[in-house]
Amino acid sequence: MGLFDKVKQFANSNNNNNDSGNNNQGDYVTKAENMIGEDRVNQFKSKIGEDRFDKMESKVRQQFSNTSINDNDSNNNDSYGSNNNDSYGSNNNDSYGSNNNDSYGSNNNDSYGSNNDDSYGSSNKKKSSYGSNNDDSYGSSNNNDSYGSNNNDSYGSNNNDSYGSNNDDSYGSSNKNKSSYGSNNDDSYGSNNDDSYGSSNKKKSSYGSSNNDSYGSNNDDSYGSNNNDSYGSNNDDSYGSSNKKKSSYGSNNDDSYGSSNNNDSYGSNNDDSYGSSNKNKSSYGSSSNDDSYGSSNNDDSYGSSNKKKSSYGSNNDDSYGSNNDDSYGSSNKKKSSYGSSNNDSYGSNNDDSYGSSNKKKSSYGSNNDDSYGSSNNNDSYGSNNDDSYGSSNRNKNSYGSSNYGSSNNDDSYGSSNRGGRNQYGGDDDY
C-alpha cells in the first residue's frame, strides 16, 4: 500500500468527531496521536504547555472537519460522457450524437436522422422528415401530411404538403401553379398542364373531367403519357422508370416504386406493398399481410378488412389502373375519362396497370397484372395480393362496393371490361 493509499484510508475512516464512546479512535487528531505514541504526545504537551496544546488540538480538529480527500464522488460535472452540459456524447444540448437539440443523429429538434422535429428520417410527430413517422413525412405512419401514412394528408389527400398535393411544387410537380393528386387545378397530378407530374400537354385538366386532358383522359399526354409506359416514363412498365422491363418508379428492377430488388412494392425491397418492408403480402406503408393501401389486415380493400367485394380499384381484371392496354393516363387512341367505359378510362380493364400503357400486365411501379405499386400478379395498389387498388378479391368490385352501379363482372371503379357492361360511367364514353 502506497503512501497516498494510506492517507486516503486514514481520511476516509475518519468521522471527524471526538466520541468518547469509541475511546477517541475516530477523529484525525486521535489517530495521529496514536500513531506518534502517547509518550511523545505527553512530552510535546509538557513542553508547550497543556493549554496551548489543547488550543492547537482544537484548531487542528476544526480544520480537518472541513476537509475531505474522498475521491469516490462520481456525480461531478464536466466528466467525459456524463449527463452534464457540453459533454461529448451526452444527452445534453449541442452534443454530438446526443438526444438533445440540434445534435447530429439525436432525437432532438432539427437533427439528422433523429426522431425529433424536422429531422431527416426521424420518428417524432412534428415538422416532417423523410421517412419518419411524423407529420408531413414521406412514408411515415403517423399524423398529418405523411406519404402513405394512415393519417390526414396522406398520399392522394387534398391537404397541403402531401405527396402530389395541390401545393406549389409538390413531390413530382415542376410547374408553378398549385398541383395535387387528381385535383382539378392547373398542373394537377396527372393533368395535362405544362409541368404536371408525368403529363406533357398544355391544357387545363381536372381529375375525372371530360376535357381534352383530364386525369386519364383521351389526349396524348395524360397521366402516364401516351407511350408504352407507366406513369411518366417512356418504358414498358413502372412508374417513372426508364428501363424496358417490369420496373418501378425510379428503379430498373422488376419491382416497386423506388425499390431496387425484385417483386417489390413502392420503395420496399420486399414482395409486398407500396412502401412496406416486410416479405409478406402487405399494403402501402403497412407491414401486415395481403393488405390494402395503408391497412394492416388481410386480403382487404383500400383500408378495409374484408376478404370479398373489393373496394376502389379491386383486383379484378379492371382495378384502379388495371392491366388494360391503356390504364390510367394511357396512350390509347380512344377518348376516355375518369370512369368512362372506353379502352382508356381511369382504372379500365385493359392489359396494364395504373399509369402504364404497355401490353404486359404491369401495375403502378410493378411488373404484375394489376396493382398500383405491387410486384405480384393481380394485385392492388401496394399489395401483392390478387387484388386491385386496395382490394383482395377477384369479383364484385367497385369503389368500396361490389359493383357501384354496374351490373357486370370483373370490373373496377370506372373500368370498361371487355365482357360486359361497365361500372360508373356507362358502357363506352364518359
Curated annotation (Swiss-Prot):
Bias-annotated ranges (Low complexity): 12-27, 70-421
Per-repeat ranges for Sequence: 74-81, 82-89, 90-97, 98-105, 106-113, 114-121, 124-131, 132-139, 141-148, 149-156, 157-164, 165-172, 175-182, 183-190, 191-198, 201-208, 209-216, 217-224, 225-232, 233-240, 243-250, 251-258, 260-267, 268-275, 278-285, 287-294, 296-303, 306-313, 314-321, 322-329, 332-339, 340-347, 348-355, 358-365, 366-373, 375-382, 393-400, 407-414
PTM sites of type Phosphoserine: S183, S191, S314, S322
Gene Ontology BP term (one): DNA repair
Primary gene name: DDR48
GO molecular function: ATP hydrolysis activity; GTPase activity
Function of the molecule: DNA damage-responsive protein that may be required for maintaining the rate of spontaneous mutagenesis. Shows low ATP and GTP hydrolysis activity. Dispensable for acquisition of thermotolerance and does not play a significant role in recovery or protection of cells from acute heat shock.
Description of what induces expression: Expression is induced by DNA damage, as well as by salt, oxidative, and heat-shock stress.
Region span, 38 X 8 AA approximate tandem repeats of S-[NS]-N-[ND]-D-S-Y-G: 74-414
Family to which the UniProt record says this protein belongs: Belongs to the DDR48 family.
Modifications after synthesis and translation: Probably highly glycosylated.
Protein name as it appears in the record: Stress protein DDR48
Record-annotated disulphide pairs: none
Inactivation phenotype: Shows a slightly altered sensitivity to killing by 4-nitroquinoline-1-oxide and to heat shock; and a 6- to 14-fold reduction of the spontaneous mutation rate of reversion of a HIS4 mutation.
Keyword entries, A-Z: Glycoprotein, Phosphoprotein, Repeat, Stress response
One cellular-component annotation, GO: cytoplasm
Region (Disordered): 1-430
Compositionally skewed regions (Basic and acidic residues) per UniProt: 37-60
Iron in keyword set: no
